[in-house]
Regions:
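Substrate/ligand-engaging "lid" and interaction regions
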Residues: 1-42, 46-461
Length: 461
């Protein structure tokens, strides 16, 4: 079995392999999207294929939406040319459930794939056509937090950004510069409203995206490269909005055991592609079942009915509360605790750590006893139930190939937010004693031990 539209016609072979297929007419979806594009997504990585693309497929399967997603890649063009187009923009989502079952689904919600390459006339002109369309409602992003950075460590604009400021929208070459250029094109073609939605896993992601795009709008309007009204357009949320969001779903690099399982079932498109930029991409993506996407409901031109696929739309304040709940109490501190001690104790799978009674006690006390008394309760999600799911279903899942080594990356930058907020809440409380905290300080001590560069058995970390 191959990921090709022509192969999907032989439904019996897919059913025999227990692989679900799209339940809608892909050709009709593509034609409708061509005429009336609604959703463009920047960033063609695993999280996109496993989450937003799957959400839209659910809406298409149920007849709630008629258009698909147009995916655009601005960092590594080879992903589009080597992984998307040769497979008719199809991918296989493998959901690894904690109860031992595996759900396999062909994702066919992508209408087309494009490179954000100004020097590729066909793709660039198609993007301009899409951005000029009044029907376009949202542009979403999974380009990592670094993707929004336009400054050097000293705070000065990077050289490529300054070059774009001088070159103007017609000649912009940086990632955000090309996005800003497309927004300017939309402005010149009638200034229809639009939502630019970062769904990257970072706090206040909408503000990060706004700051980057706004810098270009200011520079271009000040130096005469763009009309004065463009800055007003970008800074008017009734015209262009930058909603905040919180996303939570783990999509590890394609796993060898999943690859073998698919091959045994007769699925032959399993080989990973490594691009010249060292991006790993496979025709399939493996992911955990649990997923959360909370988005500020600020869409000046409408939006897909994603609430019917489980997305929660709410206020900016609530998005921030959900983010704080996850990052400061219910998920990230527990992950960091397991990552640090997992590396020290020689574990290579997070799930195996949950077989160690001492490590289970560590994260249970950090979460339930030390964290919950000062947790931020967002109202739309229960903090206790969230921790229950993390510790009873998500982390113990033996089918999730996640590692303490991956999670331990950049821990020095994470400790302050993941534990410091809880410590500050204790210090500010008249009812709680910060000296009562025992296991959160243990994580700090464990990190100091980790920095020695060797596990407890002396093996280099």
């Amino acid at each position: 079995m191959h990921l090709l539209d022509s192969e999907l016609k032989n439904k019996e072979q897919w059913e025999k392999a227990e692989i679900s297929l799209p339940q809608f007419d892909r050709q009709a979806m593509k034609e409708e999207t061509k005429k009336n594009p609604q959703w463009v997504h920047f960033g063609a990585g695993n999280i996109f294929r496993a989450f937003p693309a799957a959400l839209q497929q659910k809406l298409l399967n149920e007849g709630i939406e008629k258009t698909g997603i147009i995916v655009a890649e601005g960092y590594d063009y080879e992903i589009i040319k080597k992984a998307y187009r040769p497979q008719d923009d199809l991918s296989l989502l493998v959901t690894l459930k904690a109860n031992g079952t595996i759900e396999k689904t062909v994702i066919g919600s992508l209408a087309e794939s494009l490179t954000v390459d100004r020097h590729d006339a066909a793709d660039w002109n198609r993007l301009k056509e899409i951005f000029a369309s009044n029907t376009l409602q949202m542009v979403s992003f999974t380009i990592t937090e670094k993707g929004y950075s336009i400054t050097s460590p000293d705070g000065a604009f990077r050289a490529d950004v300054k070059a774009d400021f001088e070159a103007g929208p017609e000649n912009a070459d940086s990632y955000i510069g090309k996005l800003a250029a497309l927004c300017y094109w939309r402005y010149t073609q009638g200034a229809a409203p639009l939502a630019l939605v970062s769904i990257d896993n970072c706090s206040h992601n909408g503000d990060k995206l706004f700051a980057a795009v706004d810098a270009y709008a200011k520079a271009w309007t000040e130096n005469g490269k763009a009309e004065k009204g463009f800055l007003e357009y970008i800074e008017n949320p009734a015209k262009v909005s930058f909603p905040w969001s919180m996303i939570d779903k783990i999509t590890p690099r394609p796993d060898a055991s999943v690859k073998k399982m698919l091959e045994d079932a007769g699925f032959t498109d399993t080989e990973s592609i490594v691009t010249s930029k060292n991006t790993y991409v496979a025709p399939f993506v493996n992911a955990e079942e649990a997923q959360y996407l909370v988005i500020e409901n600020a869409f000046p031109n409408g939006r897909p009915a994603l609430e019917n696929a489980g997305v929660m739309f709410t206020s900016r304040e609530t998005v921030e509360k959900v983010e704080r709940m996850k990052v400061c109490t219910c998920l990230n501190p527990l992950h960091t605790a397991l990552a640090v001690y997992g590396c020290l104790l020689g574990y290579t799978k997070i799930s195996d750590e949950m077989k160690d009674a001492d490590l289970v006690k560590l994260v249970e006390i950090i979460g339930y006893k030390e964290g919950l008394p000062v947790v931020t309760d967002p109202g739309i999600l229960s903090p206790k139930k969230f921790i229950d799911e993390v510790l009873q279903i998500r982390v113990p899942n033996p089918f999730m190939p996640d590692t303490p080594q991956r999670i331990a990356c950049d821990t020095s930058q994470k400790l302050s937010i993941r534990f410091g907020e809880t410590i500050k809440e204790y210090m500010a409380s008249s009812e709680l004693d910060v000296k009562s905290l025992k296991f959160i300080p243990m994580v700090q001590a464990g990190w100091c031990r980790y920095l020695l560069g060797a596990s407890v058995s002396g093996v280099p970390i």
